[in-house]
Structure formats: structure tokens, C-alpha cells
């Protein structure tokens, strides 16, 4: 499972997901990518499930790039505990994903195989996603 080795603070505010992704919204490493269309928290278990689904489709060919990392701790109180008495213990880790963010990238496989693998990965996520292709930029921008 993905999680930070160490953090500056143990617990974090929930925050809010406003607007679209400002960074990480272009295919940078691979040839095809999976782009988020909705805002959500993606857990480390969901990321791992997508990684396994993609790699099983490829059968040891091609390369997978994970473009998100779960760096936000999520706390929860035990069941049957009354309100108050402080913030709960860290239960898991999530990555905050905004619309437009590239979640996974793949390279070294055909377009059909890449699209099939990324669609399988999208089924494991709680948000709508679309498969995007790398586009070359003339102006020297990102990729």
C-alpha cells in the first residue's frame, strides 16, 4: 500500500475540493493516461487495486506510471463511541483528486490494450474517468 514514510503532522483537516487540477493534467511519462472527470478522495487501496488490474491486463509487457500519491491522513472514531474527546485515530490515506488530473499512465503497449487496461482501472475508482492520449506540444510547454 502507498503511504508516506513520515509526515510533518499526524492529522490533517478535511479541506475542500474546489476547481480543476492545475498541475498533473497532461500525459507526461507514458503514451496514454486515465484522466479524472470528477473531484474525489482516492484511497491507497483503490490505487493499488487499479495498479493490479492494469498489470494483469498487460501480462508483463509495457510500463505503468502512478501519477497520484495518498499523502492525506483520514481519521475515524471507533463504532459506538460518543461525540467529543478529540479527533480519531488515522484509519487510512487518500489522495485528493480534482477534475482533469491524470491518475495513471501507460506506455509500451498498443492503443487497444492500453485503453482496455485503463478502462478496467477506471471501474475500480469511485469517479468517472476518461482515457486520454499523449499530445505533443509545439510551444515547449509540458511534454
Curated annotation (Swiss-Prot):
GO terms for biological process: translation. InterPro entries: Ribosomal_uL16, Ribosomal_uL16_bact-type, Ribosomal_uL16_CS, Ribosomal_uL16_dom, Ribosomal_uL16_sf. Keywords: Ribonucleoprotein, Ribosomal protein, RNA-binding, rRNA-binding, tRNA-binding. One of its GO terms (cellular component) is cytosolic large ribosomal subunit. The keyword tRNA-binding applies. One of its GO terms (molecular function) is tRNA binding. Pfam families: Ribosomal_L16. It comes from the Bacteria. Binds 23S rRNA and is also seen to make contacts with the A and possibly P site tRNAs. NCBIfam families: rplP_bact. PANTHER family: 50S/60S RIBOSOMAL PROTEIN L16, LARGE RIBOSOMAL SUBUNIT PROTEIN UL16M. Belongs to the universal ribosomal protein uL16 family. HAMAP family: Ribosomal_uL16. Part of the 50S ribosomal subunit. This is Large ribosomal subunit protein uL16. The lineage of its organism: Bacteria, Fusobacteriati, Fusobacteriota, Fusobacteriia, Fusobacteriales.
